[in-house]
């Protein structure tokens, strides 16, 4: 596995939800470096409805939630996936959107 500061960009290979999951799982050690306790996809990525310009919606829970972990993970995922990443923590979920997000959740790291 590459060290946390080395990113392999797989965005040209992402054509399905399964590709996205495989890439994230292959990079699990680096995700853990950023303190990821659990990571789940939601939205179009979880429903396998991503399009060329789609962002990737990610719900993440950290072992230790710090600004450095959050920003580091966001930039790492965007570099890795070649897409904008909407990174959300459970505390940031709004009550109005929480039910629709929860029904889509597809855990990749838990």
Residue ranges with predicted function:
Residues 1-38, 46-52, 63-110:
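Catalytic core of pol beta-like nucleotidyltransferases
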Residues 57-59:
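Short beta-strand->loop micro-motif that forms the acidic, two-metal-ion catalytic signature
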